[in-house]
Amino acid sequence: MMRPVSARRTARLGALAAALAAGLLTAGLAVPAAAQELPASDRLWIQAPGEQSLPLGADLPGRPLDIGLYHDNDDFTVTDGRLSVDISGLAGVAEVYWPSNCTPSGTTALCTVDEVPVLGDAYSPQVQLLVNAADGAATGAQGRITYAAVATGGPDGTVEAPHDSSTDVTVGSGPDLSVGGLAPVKGAQPGDVLTMPFTVTNRGGQRSEGLRAVITTTYGLKLPDTYAECVNGTTTGGDDVPMFTATCDFDQAVEPGGTFTLPRPLRVALADHAYRERVEVSVRPGNGATDLAEEDNYAAAGVQATNTADFEARGARVEGAAGETVTARLAFRNNGPAWIGNLGSGDSVAAVDLTVPEGVTVTSAPAGCEPRTLSGGFHPNPVGAPRYSCEMPIWTLPDTERAFPFELRVDRVVPDATGRVVLTAGGANPVTFPFDPQPANNTDRLVVNATPAS
């Protein structure tokens, strides 16, 4: 069972909500220190695939099955992880080969994990089983592997994983295409042409009668070569991330254990606006055949180019008498030369943060602009807030601008009333973007009723 990363925070918020419901936090009533200090918590989790397909035939290579342990709270150190694996449910279906950190005994094994991490960049599965179909197993045979785990650490000295982690194993017959060999590239330059070969291996027990390969590149990459078997297309316009796609149908049969490569190795050309790019390859068997294990039908590799993108915040100057409503058109601009796309994280590329000038009230905010308190916290009302944060999409092209028109009511005339307009990453504070060569223009002003120059 893989637990959502945000559950710990949700649990703490739930405890606070319960306190509210009980009347512990009421207007004018001081909250005891014990109520403010929620008890620390930590929990152990098992990460394992819910399903695993195996090709029919005991003589075929086994399938790796990656299993890992992690815990919630990085305030605690968790060690001496002990993962129990029960394969009694695989009798007559599959055989398991154990790694060196597992000690088998009959149909169970105890696998050790010296240090249990929190889920993040440093995490990787610590136990890799090798599973293949049992001799004599029939197509459609099914079994189950179950897991349990404990470790040392946490607030109580011991943490234990929920007892509902398992992997369902199914024996199937058919092709199983697997993409490999696609390697990431760092330090490339705009204008470079890179060779990025990949292979497709049939790990199944039946041959694939041809295959379809879909090659997708992000906006900063182009495919300089064409293949007769491919139809090229682009995705542009609206909120869709701009991409290039080649859909290719090859009639070459791929035997069990055999491999397929393109007629010529894949090449990609970096455009002048390239920055953080990606190449994706997905495949499926031809003639409508079903792939036994689709999880390895896809591969992706990053291409990092050395480039810059000058982000700019644009403020405004407006005038109005008391009682009038005026429009202040704020804007974000990417002066290039690079495009920026947070395709991996899905985060906004930037946010335009406005501190409302004195003497005016926001009566209408643009879509996507969240009201904030002056310190950057949650504000309940969409209008009348002292601060707003307007998020950009997850990508922005060079030499493009996005406007954010605010309707402001002038409550009283304050000469030279000024509010800050600054770019953030969506948080409460300004940031320095690593690709931006001119951070000084990330800040501007909204001025209401500026004093005329003498």
What are the residue ranges of the model-derived segments?
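A short beta-turn/strand-edge loop motif at beta-sheet boundaries
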Residues: 45-46, 73-79, 93, 204-209, ...
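Secretory targeting and sorting signals
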Residues: 1-37
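A surface/secretory-pathway sequence property marking extracellular, secreted
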Residues: 39, 78-117, 211-250, 347-389
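Short beta-strand elements of extracellular/lumenal beta-sandwich folds
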Residues: 50-79, 184-207, 316-349
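Extracellular/luminal low-complexity Ser/Thr/Pro-rich, glycosylation-prone repeat/linker regions
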Residues: 36-45, 73, 147-179, 281-313, ...
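Low-complexity, acidic Ser/Thr/Pro-rich repeat tracts that form intrinsically disordered stalk/linker regions
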Residues: 2-6, 32-61, 95-107
